[in-house]
Amino acid sequence: MAAIAIRGAEFSDLPYFYEICLKTGGAGNDASSLFYDPYIIGQYYAAPYLFFERDLCFVAEMDGVPQGYVAGASDTSAFNRWLESEWLPPLRRRYQNYAHEKIKTDVEKNSVALFYKKLDPAGEAERSFYKTYPAHLHIDLLPSLQGKGQGKALIKTLFAALVQKNVHGVHLGVSRTNAGAIAFYRKMGFASLKEEKWGLVMGAYI
C-alpha cells in the first residue's frame, strides 16, 4: 500500500511544482501538449509562491514523491506588489522576444501574456472580496492522488496555517469548465463571489 503524507514544501520541491502545475494545467487535465516551453504556466501559478511565502506551501507525496501541492499567499495585494517588483521583471525580459513560431497554442500565448499584465495592488485592494478574503490559493493534484482525500487535507492544512497568521478569508479562481473542481471547492466551504470571462472567483471564510 502506497504511503501518502503531507508536509511543508521545501525549495527542493520546485521541479515538482512546475511538473504538477503543467500536468494539471488544462482545467485539471494534462497540458503538456499545449506548451513548447513546459515551464511557462508554472512560472506564474506555482513557482513564485515558494519564494514569497513558503510557509503557506504544502505538498502531498506518495512514497516520498510529491504528487500534489497547495500554495497560498496571506495578503494578495502584497503578493502582487512583490510579483511586480521582483518576480515578473526577469520573466518579462526573458520572454519579450519569445518567438511566435515557438508558441504552440492560444493557451501558451495567453500564459505568456500574463507576465505582461500590469497588476494594480491598490485597485485590487478596493474590491470588497479582497477586504474580506485577503488570501488566495492554488491547489493541484496529479491523478494518482485524486479521490484519496488529499485535496481536502491540503486545503485544511493551509487553512490552519492561515488562521495561525490571523487570516480568516481566502479566495481562488477556477475555470467554469472545471465542474469537478467547482463542486470540490463548494464542499470545502467556498462560495461564488463573482464571475469573470475565464471562470469563477470563489471565497471562503475560515
Indicate where each model-derived feature is located:
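Conserved beta-strand in the GNAT
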Residues: 59, 65-74
